[in-house]
Amino acid sequence: MKLIVLIFFLLFINLNYCLKIKEQPKVGGIDSEQPTNSFYIENGNFLMNNQGNGGSLNQYQIISGSFHYFRCLPELWVDRLTKMKACGLNTIQTYIPWNVHQPNGFNTELVATNDLIEFLRQAQQIGLNVILRPGPYSCAEWELGGFPYWILEQQPIALRSSDSVFISAVIAYWSRLLPLLEPLLFTNGGPIIMVQVENEYGSYGEDKSYLETLLTLLQKYLGQGDGNGSGVLFHSTDGPSAQMLFGSKLEGVYQTVDFGPMPIEQIQDNFKIQQTFASKPTPPMNSEYYTGWITNWGDASAARTDASVVAQGLDDILSLNASVNMYMFFGGSNAGFMNGANSNSPTTNFEITIQSYDYDSPLSESGDTTEKYFAIKNVIEKYIKPTTNSNSTLPPIPSNSTKVAYGTIQITQATSLFNNLANLVNSNQQQLQTGAPIPMEQLQQSTGFVLYETTMNIAQSSQLSITELHDRATIFINDEAIEDTQTIGQAVFLQRPFNSSIEITYPSNVTDDGNFNLRILLENQGRVNFGPYLNDRKGLLSGGVLSGQQYLGPWNNYPLPLTNKTLSNINNWEQIKDYTLSNTPTFYQATLSLNSTNDIGDTFLSFTGLGKGQLFVNGYNVGRYWNVGPQRTIYISSVLLHQGDNEIILFETLLTQPIFEIQFLNQPYFD
């Protein structure tokens, strides 16, 4: 009897031990003995089975908003995400720009992936699912549509195609990126419910081999995504036309459409078009419902869409039991040099996206709730359905940030670009001498400026012509800018695509043999991000510079990416009262002194009195400013400021007169 009891006791201990082993979760949070999360399409509806929320199967209406993590400082993510959740959203959508995570060349290690993963985890912790758009093409009014600059080093190359060179680069990138995302799929306990294949490809081409290659790669690393709860749901996004939907159609990929506010009859028509190539009923979904629009430098005014119009369109969409993603819900900023551009004709059109990506979104660039936010919230609350396994009460809305008008502060020091060339050339990028000026890409440079330098002679023609200019050039004769006779105090510049030639005046201080120095400061104003002209290399292209009918040369090429590292090397500072070189590209320095942490808040630098250039705050490249408008201020987050002295640096490229002061306001201004 004792033996039988002992045997049963040992069996019980062994069984209990086995059960404890089975209780250990897999990577990604899945319990090996529990049913996994699932998200799939059935009978024209999204169905979700969320084990972390009771495990019941429910219809799911996606109410999503776009938030690009790369347009917002990480310290501010939780605030923006929480405000999105508090508005009633259950999902967010974001791109993953290739140039953010693999900026340094083909087959190189990825960077900033921890930031991406942290962003996705924060979204999940706040209760938001994620629609992911991993590229390889993004658009997004972002530099080169998200492609890294080095992809253009290979010429010719066909982007967004089955071109073997392009595909090999995609494979090298995705083979590193996608495995990092797999544990974060909804079926693995993460927040990712949908993954987009390419981006609005129907507006671009019909290379099915390319799309099939992308889908095969996604399935290899993220699962088959069969639409029945296995893996992740793959989808595409296109405008509501049969032609566009045909261009991106792939077997097993759920097709969605995108459009802005319009009458409900047109919305219904668009959702009918969405079903054109569907083999079974699918949920109607607008995956880019436009809450605002793009603004470009030189526009008469910033793009605006009335809050009531946006809210009515959203109400109509949700009333049809359709799902929606609002593009954008929070826009953010194009920090550094990362704004995109558009061109529908290389010879007549080049539009540059402004530094602010406010987009007239429900959350402003500084993260403030707006009239549009509350109009949208009122609509969403009509459609939030309480369930037995979730609390439909929305969280409280976080307060808006403190805004401070620091007023006018004095410029204290200045120094010329030309006195700092050796300091500013990146240690990995040396000055090169070539027969003709070479593009940025051949200098292994992504963004910023290039200075081209050569020698001319007074015997040569004074008519200078640049054969192909991308994008903006300022001419210096013996280190002095050619002044604009129409706009006093500004330098003459050549601007793509409007003008590429100039009549120069010979200087009086030439050498004995008649030689003088010619310098051209070239600015990359943002690579094209959409359309047929994506192969947008930067610099002086196609032969270089003509004096009359003669090509000039040889040339010294100085790459000037103006990174945080190179910026710290600036020296030869002079007191502003003694500075006499303001008709050259100039760095200006000022100090914003904050006595305590209570003094720190968001602020806005006014462009008043400035020309065109770049703003740096404590070494951080905040972005471009330009007096053509309609953007008139540049947002500076309190995250960039600290107690004590804060260094403000302007790199001014347009004005030929010195700058003596700058002004900080407590609100943004747009024309």
Curated annotation (Swiss-Prot):
It is found in: Lysosome. It is an enzyme of class 3 (hydrolase). One of its GO terms (cellular component) is lysosome. Glycans are attached at N228, N321, N391, N400, N499, N509, N564, N595. Its main location: other. Transmembrane segments: none annotated. The active site is at E200, E288. Its EC number is 3.2.1.23. One of its GO terms (biological process) is galactose catabolic process. It catalyses: Hydrolysis of terminal non-reducing beta-D-galactose residues in beta-D-galactosides. SUPFAM superfamilies: (Trans)glycosidases (SSF51445), Galactose-binding domain-like (SSF49785). One of its GO terms (molecular function) is beta-galactosidase activity. Keywords: Glycoprotein, Glycosidase, Hydrolase, Lysosome, Signal. Residues 1-18 form the signal peptide. Belongs to the glycosyl hydrolase 35 family. PANTHER family: BETA-GALACTOSIDASE RELATED. Cleaves beta-linked terminal galactosyl residues from gangliosides, glycoproteins, and glycosaminoglycans. This is Beta-galactosidase 1. It comes from Dictyostelium discoideum.
